[in-house]
Amino acid sequence: MCGIVGYVGAKECTAILVNSLTKLEYRGYDSAGIAVFEGDRIKTVKAKGKLKEGLIKKLENEPHFTATAGIGHTRWATHGEPSDINSHPIGNGRVSIVHNGIIENYRKLKEFLISKGYGFESQTDTEAVAKLLDYNYDGDPIDTIIRTIADIEGAYSLGIMFREHKNRIFAARKESPLIVGKGKGEMFIASDVTAIIEYTREYYLLEPGAVADITADGVTFYDMHKNVIEKELQVATWDVSAAEKGGYAHFMLKEICEQPDALKKTINPRIKGGMPDFSECGLTDEKLRNYHHIYIVGCGSAMHAGMVGKYVIEKLARTPVVVDIASEFRYRDPLLAPDDLVVIISQSGETADTLAALKLANSIGADTLAIVNVVGSSIAREAKMVMYTLAGPEISVCSTKAYMVQAAFMYLLAFRVAYARNAIDEEQCRQLISELSQIPSKVQKCVDDQTQYQKVASKLISADSLLYIGRGLDYALSMEGSLKLKEISYIHSESYAAGELKHGTISLIEDGMPVIAVATQHDLYEKTMSNIKEVKTRGATVVMVCSEDMKFDGNDVDYPVMLPLARDLLMPLVAVVPLQLIAYYTAALKNFDVDHPRNLAKSVTVE
């Protein structure tokens, strides 16, 4: 959610900090600020609102900075309303900090500090940490930080400055991600690589419970006992162009158009000898044969990808699969055992609820497989097995290509599970893989012809509410389509299993209400068409997403969206593209900030 940056080097740092913060805008925020060493003091500038209208405008009225070290922050309000006073950095002149996460025991800390004579100005939990650092300060910043974080409960990452230690910045974390970037004669801290990729591709992952002491010459890592930790340098595999729009109006549109390539990068390395291969992570056929239950856990779009996985695994492997929302999984006392497999899906690898679900599964002894996009992320490190989707950075808050490759992984897993359990033979598995390998070209056809999606979007922009319906795999897909639309167009939408309409929801249908029907499954087509007729009779405006060979009465469908033919089982990978583009163009026609929808954050690192 919030974004942290920091710099120490030879260059004037204000512009670097602000530029790095702009790279973290996709994470979501409501205020921003920086703190830098100026002379013998720490200078802080912060403002409510977006960077351009808030912090950057405020900095234009400030005297020229000469500082070469500082920290910065974009805040997503959790404790205290969005305001200048609640913005970060927060400190008292001697200490300044930026903070991502939630301090669960901040009230207790605050009461203690008030008893010691400290006053509080903001409504934030962050201020309790800043004042506790000041209270514990003994001249040694590492000792001070270790004593302080030992008393903090919750998930957090911190960037810290001490007035008496110029040209040094410090970092610490528990759960919430933070990296330390290594440049030439300069060092950085950041919530993720996107913030610093313009300056360096080399970085260290800060481990939970570790403290980093950073100067222009390098970094020293300490554990909670002040022992020095040796860290391996990581190298980002993508370049700065991947984090730029490249001529597209929005990152979301760019990322939708990148999906054919993202699919190839995810699918091709996992095929060996024409068969899906999971040997790199240790997921053997013997394991797949012996798992008693398979659980798939995720949030939002990741959970929807898991729903596709459930349908496909059950259909091919005849193995029961449970799909759970991560925030529910850990609290419902799941019936897990050591012979169960829990598949954890997360784009960032830092989603707090999903990480907590993973830790629960590990604690019970179940096998865990993480499907993530970010190498070295918390979920990747915590899981017993991990597979990377290799989709490249996804900047838009609204997930598109990450969902696509997560769903593709579900197919690869389903094929291997079915083969390992002798539900399909080798020839059948090879045929499925062959057809899956053709999906990128079919997705490309959907991406190339966007006029039909724009036409549909122009009819949706005035809607107050709409429904998505489908059956089987189409229902799983309708859930994702509905989420995309509501996320960025702010139009209320719900997805329903088409057969459930008559059990109550059909009472909502009135003249002109849009209903988007996903109907790609030939064996369910007639049933879905009967539901389409039901809503059409009651005045609905019907958009139908279907394969190009499907026949229908023009009186029943107002706006058909025709798709390239593929095996029914694989159609979710094709049909999701029109749903993404319909949502995109609806929001764009309404002149909304497509990449940064209100109240949403890209990486939800708090529970």
Where are these regions (language model features)?
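Conserved short alpha-helical segments that host acidic/polar catalytic motifs at enzyme active sites
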Residues: 1-245, 249, 261-268, 272-292, ...
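Structural beta-sheet core signal
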Residues: 4, 36, 160, 171, ...
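Glycine-rich oxoanion-binding loops at beta->alpha junctions
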Residues: 68-85, 272-285, 309-345, 351, ...
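Extended hydrophobic-aromatic, low-complexity segments
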Residues: 181, 305-306, 322-323, 352-355, ...
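Active-site phosphate/pyrophosphate-binding segments
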Residues: 259-263, 267-295, 385-514, 587-607
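Glycine-rich phosphate-binding loops that contact phosphosugars or nucleotide phosphates
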Residues: 289-431, 435-438, 518-562, 590
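Generic C-terminus detector
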Residues: 556, 566-607
